[in-house]
Amino acid sequence: MFKKLFGKGKEVQKDIAIYAPLTGEFVKIEDIPDPVFAQKMMGEGFGINPTEGEVVSPIAGRVDNVFPTKHAIGLKADNGLELLVHIGLDTVQLDGEGFEVLVSSGDEVNVGDPLVRFNLEYINNNAKSVISPIIITNTDQAASINIYDENAVIKGETKVIDVTMN
């Protein structure tokens, strides 16, 4: 009753679509050249081999965490889904060089909102790989995950995963 009185009783959708945060080539999680991601130690997901240097929000929600080294962003949807967008592999070692973060922790975002710009050539030359993992970090709280095996994906437009949360 109190939730209704104070406007916090809105129905939260359990289903959510995750869109491509980068434009490029879809990579199955098992094919990401890093065992932490490929063996799903951090959760279920996919990768993208980007063809341009801009990351957009793959979901509507809020920015939960901007890593100090600018190479990764954590997002959280209203239904509890937690998503990590990790730009490249071993990019933490670049210490923020080549990245420009466009959001702050706590910011509300919609699908397609720009999050980070990065120098694709710099990362390609200075990191292990530009393949960028997108991981559902609370996979254990999902009732179902359906990943569409796409080839080419377009940031903010191509639906890559449907998730139903518990």
UniProtKB/Swiss-Prot annotation:
Residues where Phosphohistidine is found: H86
Any GO MF annotation of the entry: metal ion binding
Annotated site location: Important for phospho-donor activity: H71
Predominant location category: cytoplasm
Location of this chain's protein in the cell: Cytoplasm
Domain PTS EIIA type-1 per the UniProt entry, residue ranges: 34-138
GO CC terms, sorted: cytoplasm
Residues annotated as binding Zn(2+): H71, H86
Required cofactor names: Zn(2+)
Co-factor: note: Binds 1 zinc ion per glycerol kinase EIIA-Glc dimer. The zinc ion is important for dimerization.
Keywords associated with the record: Cytoplasm, Kinase, Metal-binding, Phosphoprotein, Phosphotransferase system, Sugar transport, Transferase, Transport, Zinc
Residues forming the catalytic site: H86
One GO BP: phosphoenolpyruvate-dependent sugar phosphotransferase system
Domain notes: The EIIA domain is phosphorylated by phospho-HPr on a histidyl residue. Then, it transfers the phosphoryl group to the EIIB domain.
Summary of subunit composition and partner proteins: Heterodimer with glycerol kinase (glpk).
UniProt function note: The phosphoenolpyruvate-dependent sugar phosphotransferase system (sugar PTS), a major carbohydrate active transport system, catalyzes the phosphorylation of incoming sugar substrates concomitantly with their translocation across the cell membrane. The enzyme II complex composed of PtsG and Crr is involved in glucose transport.
Protein name per Swiss-Prot or TrEMBL: PTS system glucose-specific EIIA component
